[in-house]
């Protein structure tokens, strides 16, 4: 049995038994990792707080060769993004980000770029408009996946130029791209279409965003 350590983002957790949970992580070094966290439901669980969605953690896990589920040994919080610090709109987008990452991340694959992108967007969400960050996030996920088409084939020349420029910026600079509300909406429709086409389904959280915002 090999033991691994990596920075990670907690993506999702769901019950496995009365006291255990299966947890999905995006790790910096090993891609998507699914593992069992034992004793999570106990009052003094060592995992307290670290399994909340999109928590930045230092993860230690072990796994036998050819075993699908790892065993989560330790999960230390580096940075949390608790729901009470954000509006309901931001929290809804966070749920969307989690679902995107579950779908696009791959197991046993280096995910340095995807991890850095995700963490930067989460950190910027404390200061910048969440809808603009969501577009930046979607565009880069599609690009990293290799399924982002030439923008001038999908957008007007002016908007394609703006979006190309935005993607060259650091996430903290996205507002300087100068996208109008109408342009953001057009970009949202395009990203939603591209994600849905690639995954061959519409994400549940995308439906909620469309209905509520």
Model-derived segments and their meaning:
Residues 1-21, 26-213:
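Non-catalytic alpha-helical scaffolds and adjoining flexible linkers that form interface surfaces
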């Amino acid at each position: 049995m090999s033991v691994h350590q990596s920075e990670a983002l907690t993506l999702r957790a769901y019950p496995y038994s009365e006291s255990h949970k299966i947890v999905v992580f995006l790790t910096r070094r090993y891609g998507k990792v699914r593992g069992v966290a034992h004793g999570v439901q106990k009052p003094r669980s060592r995992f307290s707080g670290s399994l909340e969605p999109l928590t930045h953690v230092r993860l230690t896990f072990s796994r036998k060769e050819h075993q699908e589920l790892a065993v989560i040994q330790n999960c230390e919080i580096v940075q949390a993004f608790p729901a009470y610090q954000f509006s309901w709109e931001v929290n809804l987008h966070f749920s969307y980000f989690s679902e995107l990452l579950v779908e696009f991340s791959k197991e046993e694959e280096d995910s340095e770029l995807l991890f850095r992108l995700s963490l930067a967007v989460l950190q910027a969400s404390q200061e910048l408009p969440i809808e603009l960050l969501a577009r930046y996030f979607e565009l880069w996920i599609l690009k990293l996946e290799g399924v982002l088409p030439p923008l001038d084939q999908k957008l007007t020349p002016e908007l394609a130029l703006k979006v190309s420029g935005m993607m060259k910026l650091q996430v903290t600079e996205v507002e300087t791209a100068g996208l109008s509300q109408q342009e953001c909406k057009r970009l949202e429709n395009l990203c939603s279409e591209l994600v849905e086409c690639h995954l061959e389904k519409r994400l549940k959280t995308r439906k909620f965003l469309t209905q509520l915002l």
